[in-house]
Amino acid sequence: MAGNDWLNSYLEAILDVGPGLDDAKSSLLLRERGRFSPTRYFVEEVIGFDETDLYRSWVRASSSRSPQERNTRLENMCWRIWNLARQKKQLESEAVQRVNKRRLERERGRREATADMSEDLSEGERGDPVSDVSTHGGGDSVKSRLPRISSADAMETWVNSQKGKKLYIVLISIHGLIRGENMELGRDSDTGGQVKYVVELARALGSMPGVYRVDLLTRQVSSPDVDWSYGEPTEMLAPRNTDEFGDDMGESSGAYIIRIPFGPRNKYIPKEELWPYIPEFVDGAMGHIIQMSKALGEQIGSGHAVWPVAIHGHYADAGDSAALLSGALNVPMIFTGHSLGRDKLEQLLKQGRLSTDEINSTYKIMRRIEAEELALDGTEIVITSTRQEIEEQWRLYNGFDPVLERKIRARIRRNVSCYGRYMPRMSVIPPGMEFHHIAPLDGDIETEPEGILDHPAPQDPPIWSEIMRFFSNPRKPVILALARPDPKKNITTLVKAFGECRPLRELANLTLIMGNRDGIDEMSSTSSSVLLSVLKLIDKYDLYGQVAYPKHHKQSDVPDIYRLAAKTKGVFINPAFIEPFGLTLIEAAAYGLPMVATKNGGPVDIHRVLDNGLLIDPHDEKSIADALLKLVSNKQLWAKCRQNGLKNIHLFSWPEHCKTYLSKIATCKPRHPQWQRSEDGGESSESEESPGDSLRDIQDLSLNLKFSLDGERSGDSGNDNSLDPDGNATDRTTKLENAVLSWSKGISKDTRRGGATEKSGQNSNASKFPPLRSRNRLFVIAVDCDTTSGLLEMIKLIFEAAGEERAEGSVGFILSTSLTISEIQSFLISGGLSPNDFDAYICNSGSDLYYPSLNSEDRLFVGDLYFHSHIEYRWGGEGLRKTLIRWASSITDKKSENNEQIVSPAEQLSTDYCYAFNVRKAGMAPPLKELRKLMRIQALRCHPIYCQNGTRLNVIPVLASRSQALRYLYVRWGFELSKMVVFVGECGDTDYEGLVGGLHKSVILKGVGSRAISQLHNNRNYPLSDVMPLDSPNIVQATEGSSSADIQALLEKVGYHKG
């Protein structure tokens, strides 16, 4: 291409580069349109790039003096614009394809689930799935979405009804800097509105009647870069109003921030880097909850542990943690997403600036999404701030389908079987707000003496003068925006709208409170980029003296900032592209500020209730400017919006929020560990050796106990909590009682024989059942070897490394594997090992737990009486099994002559809580993420695991795993995780990541299980490095071919000392 001078004039024509026309010379069309520019619309909306960025590129391209070089630069720029526009179209096409694919998958899964659930209904009962659902779910009114506070009498009645209850509630929010006073909101992207929300929620719940204690668990940060207060283990949250509900205070009652140490000890890191340390947090949090439950039991539980009535996770990382804690402790879980990963991914892809890989690398977005999916699997209730979050964001997830959710809910109301399908309930509960510190304005600008804001009085808040110093005319109304400098907050569009509208500039000032900063160079790249863009726009539109952007403010200054804007008859604006809720809008309304807010997200619901402002399209500068101008120029409208806000603000209060919150918790089916523990950590049952308390407890839990060695299922289980259709409950109970009586007699006959505990000089604890309770340390062998001979070699190596401690009995061993108990028996016999060489056997990938029998003549192993009741939450039973078999039959080798089936059921290997499948061609089996997606779309909750180098698939309960089984041993028997050493290979089964990380020590044996890296882990949603804390001091790696002496040296390195 030659002679590109025309490009310069073309770009000059479509860019606003020259001096603006004054109103007298501008065309009537432009004046009527409010300076609407068709060319700018083309640049920013059609091409999809900011005019300022394009102008900057054009200036650089045309700055060369050489005509030939300038032509070349302009040509390259045009090709770049063309390529970017083409890329944008490609991204839009890919987005449409993703939506269509998701819709087809959802519809297919919905059809299959509905067909399965319709098997037991007559033709007249089935009806149309959607119409059947609508009669039970939809049509929520505004009142049902945003419950209004009751009258004083109704509230008093409710308070009286809660007296006598003493609930323990656990909240989790692990990222950011959290403290009760002087919160550093806006310091970074992790310390924002969520921090304030969880602190105020904990404080408000702690003041409610019927709530004895609230713990807000977060990360302990002892970094020199942050204040010392973030390193304090415990901080009490004093109630705002001690007169509220303080009549039943006790020794440990109230609300507390509990800081759990995990991750790098002396470093404050962003939330994207916390993922590998989640297991360590879970272990630490579990220790605190168990300790606190025991302490509360002594105070208010008559000696019985008081377990949390719910564990509430906030954001994806805490949702992942809450799900693991809920499974380990067997208590209900609640989840609040705050900001959702799938929605963020869609927004970033639409921008077209980053590829999926780049997004995942920067934000760890796939790990975040999987955590949110796991939270949906484990939670009873999802609490949202708005209906929009449910309808437009949560429906993007495989684990939630609004139509299927209403269908399942309708069947539950009719007491009809759901065939193992579960869906969390979505509840809209707007965040509350504290009103104690809000005082009405003590004056109005119209009644103040002249110049009151030009020369602030000494008693005026210091932040006022800090803002006013920016303005040449401080008496004008203040347009206030309070948000951190984040692209999604859309501050630059607000500044453009202000700069483009001359009437607005003449009538008002703009105040931007964009967090705290010392220097622009010290800010994160994203934040500094936004701030620089704002400063350049201020310079471009010559807004000096009209825009304030103070560098610092304290949290205590925020009320004064609102008061200043209200005193000047200003407006509060939230122009974010999408606002999950918009708590600042409620705060502003409480101070008498009308609002202008985005029409995307929570502000729609807030505006519907408060009716105190206008909604705008955040992408439309003219819409923003017009709304602001309308409010600041029309005093009657301003006064009406102000009055509406003040009149209706009481609809958003913490007491009402907590009342609704507690009523939702009350609907959760109570779950907690079923056994009772004595003070010394033992069982409080009649027999010290018995792991169970009584047959009555077993019968109440409807446990399907299994004491056989063949590993076969003893009957169908866990259909969906419905009654036995064959009416065989009596026969089943009789079989259970006979089995337990026989087992108990076997225990009483003899003490443990063989192994290290044969010695008569053993301490008195040796007779305890199971033997692991008497150990000082536990070695957990969870090595997923390629062959059984390799596993035997590793076991003997670890036995040898234990040395004298094994002979003395101070160290016990646990075998953790995907094998069934019958396969383990065969393996032990062939390897010349005794069942008593191990204190426990975690079988079937963590779905079964056995101990060596004290009477080995009668039977070699006995199952834990309570383990299945602990892990059976949302187990799909027969409904899940049928769906899995149908899925397996569809996986065939299309290249073979007879469409050979790749995945087939392994009935002889399956148990009540583990459905096993043989995989003939591991390389051709679908990746696990596809199976998880399929099950979630059909509302089936499970944990599929490829094991034994991909030749077997085990499907177990959703919150069960080998790592969770170790946590169960801690909860059940009190054996501390920090005293466990877990041996794993270089890689292993697809649950491998859960075994590395946590409070236990981990020894990675290089060269063992390495084949699984390519066989099983290539098709992961996220790399292992995103979830494995290889820099943890609790993890050491043994070189290939290490000897027992090498392993002993590694154990000393991680702090393991003999004795």
Curated annotation (Swiss-Prot):
Q: State its Enzyme Commission number(s).
A: 2.4.1.14
User: Acidic residues bias located where?
Assistant: 681-691
Alphabetically, the GO molecular function entries are: sucrose-phosphate synthase activity
What is the name listed in the Swiss-Prot or TrEMBL entry for this protein?
Probable sucrose-phosphate synthase
Is Lipid biosynthesis tagged as a keyword?
no
Record's subunit section: Homodimer or homotetramer.
The family database entries (InterPro entries) matched by this protein are listed as: Glyco_trans_1, HAD_sf, SPP-like_dom, SPS, SPS_C, SPS_pln, Sucrose_synth_GT-B1
* Enzymatic reactions: beta-D-fructose 6-phosphate + UDP-alpha-D-glucose = sucrose 6(F)-phosphate + UDP + H(+)
Activity modulation notes: Activity is regulated by phosphorylation and moderated by concentration of metabolites and light.
Q: Which GO terms describe its biological process?
A: sucrose biosynthetic process
Q: Where is the composition biased (Basic and acidic residues)?
A: 102-114
* Function summary: Plays a role in photosynthetic sucrose synthesis by catalyzing the rate-limiting step of sucrose biosynthesis from UDP-glucose and fructose- 6-phosphate. Involved in the regulation of carbon partitioning in the leaves of plants. May regulate the synthesis of sucrose and therefore play a major role as a limiting factor in the export of photoassimilates out of the leaf. Plays a role for sucrose availability that is essential for plant growth and fiber elongation.
Database matches in Pfam families: Glycos_transf_1, GT-B_Sucrose_synth, S6PP
Q: Mind listing the UniProt keywords for this protein, alphabetically?
A: Glycosyltransferase, Transferase
For this protein, the record's NCBIfam families field holds: sucrsPsyn_pln
Disordered: region residues = 95-145, 671-695, 710-731, 748-769
Q: Which family does it belong to?
A: Belongs to the glycosyltransferase 1 family.
Please give the superkingdom of this protein's source: Eukaryota
- Which biological pathway? Glycan biosynthesis; sucrose biosynthesis; sucrose from D-fructose 6-phosphate and UDP-alpha-D-glucose: step 1/2
